[in-house]
Amino acid sequence: MHSDKGQTLPIYIWLTGILLFAAFAFFAFAQAASARNGAQSAADAAALAAAQDARDELLDGLVEAMGQDEDWLDWLDGDLAQGAGATAAAQQLAAENDATLQGGAVPTEVNGYPGYEVAVRTNYTVGESVIPGTEGMHANAHATAVIQPRCDIGPDVGPEKAVELDCDGEIVDIDPENFELDDLPDASVLFSVHLAE
C-alpha cells in the first residue's frame, strides 16, 4: 500500500506540470490574439481615416469646380479624389491606436469604387510567454476602406442646371447659378466610407 502512494506522486507531479504548461501556452495564444485584434483595430481606423480625408477632399473639389464653371457633377462619382492627406490621416489614427503605418495609404479600387489600403504594425509586442520569441513579436494587419457615392444623378442632368440629388433617401438641391457653400450638406451625405468586406 505504501509503495502505491509512492508511485502515484510522480504521476501527479507530471500531470500537474502538463496542466500548468497548457495553461501558460493558452495564455500565450490569448496574448497573441489580443495583439492581432489590436493591430486589426488600428488598421481599420487608419484605412477609414485615409478614405474620410479623401472624401473631404472630394467635397472641396466639388465646390471649387462649381466656382470655376467646370463639370462639377464628375466629382460626385468619387473617382477624382487625389488623397493628398490620406497617408497623414492614416498615420495619425494608427499612432492613436499604438501602431505604426507601414508604407502609406495606397489608393486602390474595390468593386469599381475608389478606396485606400493600409498596413500597420503594433508598437507593442505580444510579450513574454512559455513560447520562445514572443517577447519580440509585433502584430501586423491590413485593411481597406472604400468611398462610395450615395447620390443618384438623372441622365438628363447637366452641370449648368439646378439639380435635385437623391442621396440614399435624403434630397439635396443644388443650383450652380445660385450656389452658396451652405447649400451643400456634410460630405458623409454625398459619400459613404466603409471597410471593404
Give, region by region, the residue ranges found by the protein language model.
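Low-complexity, S/T/G/P-rich flexible repeat/linker segments used as non-globular hinges
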Residues: 127-197
